[in-house]
A protein has these predicted regions:
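Bacterial N-terminal signal peptides that target proteins for export
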Residues: 1-12
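Intrinsically disordered, low-complexity Ser/Thr/Pro-rich tracts
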Residues: 5, 19-31
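Bacterial N-terminal signal peptides
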Residues: 11-20
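Short, low-complexity N-terminal intrinsically disordered segments enriched in polar/charged residues
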Residues: 26-67, 71-75, 227
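A solvent-exposed, acidic/Ser-Thr-rich amphipathic alpha-helical stretch
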Residues: 66-167
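Short beta-strand edge/turn micro-motifs at domain boundaries
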Residues: 161-165, 183-216
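Ser/Thr/Gly/Pro-rich low-complexity, disordered linker/stalk segments of secreted
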Residues: 224-242
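Intrinsic low-complexity, glycine/proline- and repeat-rich
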Residues: 251-318
Length: 318
């Protein structure tokens, strides 16, 4: 079915090109049909990648992290070993590490939120198992919506990887706490496995956040909302000003000793003097080969032919 959809999309792109160029133009000898087909394939790839990113947004919004990891993240062992989920304070590296934080940590966060909601609403759940509570009340009273905008999708010339950028104005809220708006930059790498695009590296860097009813000069409640799951669910409400709060991972999840967590100290405190993280942003452009040396996400402007990097050596060096 998916293959059929891809073929239909490619044919639709070719049809659009035919209409734009004109049938007469295609009949001329100077029209390279292989080039036209390549253009159509790239357009198809870009649309599929956009759809996958949108699925990530909705999976996260509905708390379906397990389904997300199983459906749209990488499957091949080599790619799973080098998969990463990054935020301002560091990176989870490896599929198992991401799973522990993004799936298991999320379930823990949602359970705490569900119990809190039931307590506030005088709902009797005495004798219920954790699984029953999650099934009925998981996600109730919680909002996690990271809308993606300004898509920049660069597919490699070999059609096997892609570097992408989105900006996200988002909203996070939890029952009993003040909601926050959150402004983030997403840098995402995709890789094609058996003809299907899969999410490989997901890096999300927060520029700033503020309460729904407060100015940036006011106070915020809770932490950010990411791998650990709750949008501030595990972040403690604080009377301190946002400048004094130390930012934690989404849901406040802590890395397990079983997995590697690459700590990056570039963003420890919020500062009104600089409403950006200390991470310099590089936007995806046409590029030559996949490289980590261009920053934590985003390439330089070069022609891009293939991925071409020893990931093990890069991780050892960093």
């Amino acid at each position: 079915m998916k293959k059929t959809i891809r073929i239909l999309l490619s044919l639709a792109c070719v049809a659009a090109l035919v209409l734009s160029l004109g049938v007469g133009a295609l009949a001329k000898s100077d029209i390279d049909l292989e080039e036209v087909a390549a253009m159509a394939q790239k357009a198809c790839d870009q649309q599929e990648i956009q759809n996958i990113m949108s699925w990530h947004v909705m999976y996260h919004c509905y708390g379906l992290h397990r389904e997300e990891m199983e459906e749209i993240w990488v499957n091949e062992p080599e790619n799973r070993a080098t998969a990463s989920f990054g935020q301002n304070q560091g990176f989870y590296v490896g599929y198992d590490s991401i799973w522990e934080a993004y799936v298991e940590g999320h379930d823990t966060s949602w359970l705490a939120t569900a119990k809190n909601y039931c307590a506030q609403s005088d709902i009797d759940i005495e004798g219920w198992t954790d699984e029953e509570i999650l099934e009925v009340y998981g996600g109730v009273g919680q909002l996690l919506l990271h809308v993606t905008t300004t898509a920049i999708i660069e597919v490699a010339e070999d059609g096997q990887t892609a570097k992408c950028f989105w900006y996200s104005p988002g909203m996070i809220a939890e029952s009993g706490q003040t909601g926050n708006t959150i402004w983030e930059a997403y840098g995402v790498d995709f890789v094609k496995e058996d003809g299907e695009w899969k999410m490989w590296h997901l890096h999300m860097f927060t520029d700033f956040m503020g309460g729904f009813y407060l100015t940036l000069g006011g106070k915020t409640s809770g932490g950010m909302g990411g791998p650990g799951g709750g949008g501030g669910a595990s972040g403690e409400a604080s009377g301190d000003s946002s400048e004094q709060q130390e930012w934690k991972g989404e849901g406040g999840a802590q890395a397990s000793s079983k997995h590697d967590y690459l700590y990056s100290p570039q963003y420890k405190e919020f500062s009104h003097d600089r409403l950006r993280s200390d991470m310099e942003i590089f936007l995806p452009k046409a590029y030559d080969e996949w490289s980590f040396d261009d920053g934590n996400y985003g390439p330089t402007r070069e022609e891009y032919e293939s991925f071409g990097i020893d990931l093990d050596a890069w991780y050892d060096a960093h």
